[in-house]
């Protein structure tokens, strides 16, 4: 199965200051558990979509430091206020389904 996780607000806290983002360890542990059980993990972010800044190298270093196991890191996710998709799960619902207690 393929899982696609947003980065900011899903696996880490952020107030649009990516340098100050704090990882959600419990979420990262769950992602790593999925990875280790053979699931395909994609990390997807809109970092730089509005500003045009290339955050790829910084983001790769950051998620490596946090120990997030993944197969792909994709930038270029569009910025939006509401995302409608037939396969989307809200991060808070996913936390609840997986008994994750995330504090921001």
Sequence positions of predicted segments:
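Catalytic phosphate/metal-binding cores of nucleic-acid and nucleotide-processing enzymes, i.e., regions
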Residues: 1-104
């Amino acid at each position: 199965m393929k899982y696609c996780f947003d980065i900011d607000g899903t696996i880490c806290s952020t107030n649009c200051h990516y340098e100050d983002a704090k990882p959600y360890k419990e979420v990262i542990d769950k992602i790593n558990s999925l990875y280790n059980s053979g699931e395909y993990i994609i990390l997807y972010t809109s970092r730089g979509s509005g500003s045009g800044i290339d955050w790829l190298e910084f983001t790769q270093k950051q998620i490596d430091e946090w120990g997030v196991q993944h197969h792909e890191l994709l930038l270029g996710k569009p910025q939006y206020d509401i995302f409608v998709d037939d396969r989307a799960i809200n991060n808070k619902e996913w936390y609840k389904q997986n008994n994750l207690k995330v504090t921001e």
